[in-house]
Amino acid sequence: MPAHVTPRTEDARRGAGPSSACGCSWFCHLRPVEDPASPSVCLAAVATMHGTSRTSATSVNADCCIPAGLRLGPVPGTFKLGKYLSDRREPGPKKKVRMVRGELVDESGGSPLEWIGLIRAARNPQEQTLEAIADLPGGQIFYRALRDVQPGEELTVWYSNSLAQWFDIPTTATPTHDEKGEERYICWYCWRTFRYPNSLKAHLRFHCVLSGGGGRAFLPQEHAARPGASPVAEGLGLPPKPTVPDLTAPVQAIALRPQAPAAQLAQACGARESIKREASLAPLATSPPPGKWGTPKKGKEQPDRAHSQFLGIVGGSSGGGGGLPFYPGVRSAFKPAGLARAAAQSDPYREEGGGKGPGLALGRLLGGGRAGGRPGSGESPAGHHHHHHHAHHHHHHHPKCLLAGEPPPAGLPCPGALRAFPLLAGHPEEASAFKHVERAPPAAATTSLPSARYAALPAPGLPVERCALQPLDGGSLKAYPGGGGGGECSPLPAVMPAFTVYSGDLLYGPPAAYYPLKLHLGGLLKYPESISYLSGPAAAAAAAAAAAAAAAAIGPAELGSLASIDREIAMHTQQLSEMAAGKSRARLDSGTLPPAVVAATGPGGGGGGGSAAGKPKTGHLCLYCGKLYSRKYGLKIHMRTHTGYKPLKCKVCLRPFGDPSNLNKHIRLHAEGNTPYRCEFCGKVLVRRRDLERHVKSRHPGQSLMAKAGDGPGPEPSYALEPGDPKSEDSDVDVCFTDDQSDPEAGGRGEHDS
């Protein structure tokens, strides 16, 4: 926040910037800031939305039709889109913009640079009209129209998927449903509830202290320009810092005019070398005091709850160890349990501990990740490095590029071409509040891995299978100890390059350019039958052997050692499904299947109970009690027993019901001419003979059902035939792999009908 507010700054904050302020306002952010206490109009407007003020509720509305694909920007200043986003829209003045000679201007003729900071963040994709994009990682940020914006519609913006991954913003959010069936989005760290998905994403990134996002959200120089930073590195907050950090130096703007390609190349090389010199000091320096750097001490005590699905790769070099954090995949607010476990096992950077070595050899990490200490323990060589890196950057965004300790050789070229290859698509997750899970018998978990099929790779292995880097010209090269590949593996350079993931592409390269990285991620990606960039069948077999060795290095005991179930693990469907499968297997072994399941799997159902025990069970899992339902509708009705939601009512007595079958049976009690069954032991009236038999068995054990049930009608078919009756409204709804005593819908159904 500026020290004092000038009239121009106040006008910009209210969205009524003077018309004379912008003869060349498109480039007002290009001039150096001579007086930090009185910023320009456009910088004040951007600071209003992203960093300093909550009072302004000015919105930007379209006064005419805005075509799809129109670009606005670049966005100047510190970019913190969504920092003050909430579910509620505060009313306020509206700034109308219209197209004039192909350019979007406001009522006073001001260019987008004056009011682009007033565009509010979108709460959900339905109301979003613009998306924030960047052409290159670290490039300038623009707004692009997603569709044709109609007159009177508000302009709202949110991150594109590639930009969200770069800024550590979750890209997906799975809704849950409250007792009224309305969608809600819950933060499983602090238990806050939101109505819109983007509100949850912004909360996780900027405000949730338990998830680690709140401590890095209020930094005055985050993503700010620094002297000597390259144009590529300024927009997304990856500028090289001086060797001696100075957090009190005023932020100065730099020229962003297009430069010659040669000048950009030399400047990028200098920026990369500056980052490298800073990284080389990280393992040697001690942790600075919290008062100087502002790093909260509780950051060391936070549990391993990493939302980012990234993999820490440590490369040993000739001159010393250096960390190479690598961020594959999409950062989701609700991560599948399989990926969470894989990231926790292969992610030494998220754990704290005292470093005992310069670095972990990449070959050992690829071979099983056991030589450098178990991740999560104090033996991890990367623990100290990550702690210092976390404090050194003052909780900035995790840098997507970090070079190793040694500078490149003098003869190392710096080509300017930017190349990449797209990552292979992974297994899609169902966007549903009730996840579909599949459980197999215990024997299926120990089957051998095929040697030539990538599609059959096990999910719970070390995500790295094989890493082959393109040989760099100049400098000494060395090969890593292969995991069964012999001489088929490409050599690794002595100076490890930088890594980055942007827009679905995995990039690496020397200090001046990125190159494609050939990397296979076991369990995270689904491979096709053949991969063209593997060097022949021998290399494919070597990669499969390395994957099998990595999977075999993790024993069943380690895979089964899960933490105690808390609020976060309650959303991990794989862990809960394992618990439910264990209960189901125990019931199968003890022969205590419910009658409905026994009848369905009997001679009339196409198989006996023994054959059902060897078949994998698929279904929908209840996250409250662990029951497994064969159909989603059955789980939906069952969930009402936990939430107490009863949307159905009897039209005669207005009694509420949550299960339609219970309501149908209750209505039959009011029907004339349909005399129900009556229990001769307690006088309870029931609708069907099946209900009477179940009632006698559960409430009057040891008693036998009489042939004549009260004043009921003639005898009905035996109990064993009724589960297959097409008129049945109970068992045909769904099959639950539980016993009657633990099922409130089955065992306690008699009480519901009273």
From Swiss-Prot:
First and last residues of each zinc finger (C2H2-type): 185-207, 620-642, 648-670, 677-700
Basic residues composition-biased segments: 383-400
GO MF, one annotated term: histone methyltransferase activity
Localization annotation: Nucleus
Annotated stretches, region: Disordered: 279-304, 345-404, 694-754
All copies of domain SET, residue ranges: 39-160
InterPro entries the UniProt entry points to: PRDM13_PR/SET (IPR044407), SET_dom (IPR001214), SET_dom_sf (IPR046341), Zinc_finger (IPR050331), Znf_C2H2_sf (IPR036236), Znf_C2H2_type (IPR013087)
Entry's Gene Ontology BP terms: GABAergic neuron differentiation; hypothalamus cell differentiation; methylation; negative regulation of transcription by RNA polymerase II; neurogenesis
Gly residues bias: start-end ranges: 355-376
GO CC term, one of those recorded: nucleus
Disulphide-bonded residues: none
Pfam family, one: zf-C2H2
Free-text tissue specificity from the UniProt record: Expressed in the brain, hypothalamus, and embryonic nose and brain tissues.
Database matches in Gene3D superfamilies: Classic Zinc Finger (3.30.160.60), SET domain (2.170.270.10)
Primary location group: nucleus
Keywords from the named record: DNA-binding, Metal-binding, Methyltransferase, Nucleus, Repeat, S-adenosyl-L-methionine, Transcription, Transcription regulation, Transferase, Zinc, Zinc-finger
Entry's EC annotation: 2.1.1.-
Role, per record: May be involved in transcriptional regulation. Is required for the differentiation of Kiss1-expressing neurons in the arcuate (Arc) nucleus of the hypothalamus. Is a critical regulator of GABAergic cell fate in the cerebellum, required for normal postnatal cerebellar development.
Family of this protein: Belongs to the class V-like SAM-binding methyltransferase superfamily.
The name this protein goes by in its record: PR domain zinc finger protein 13
Organism from which the protein derives: Mus musculus
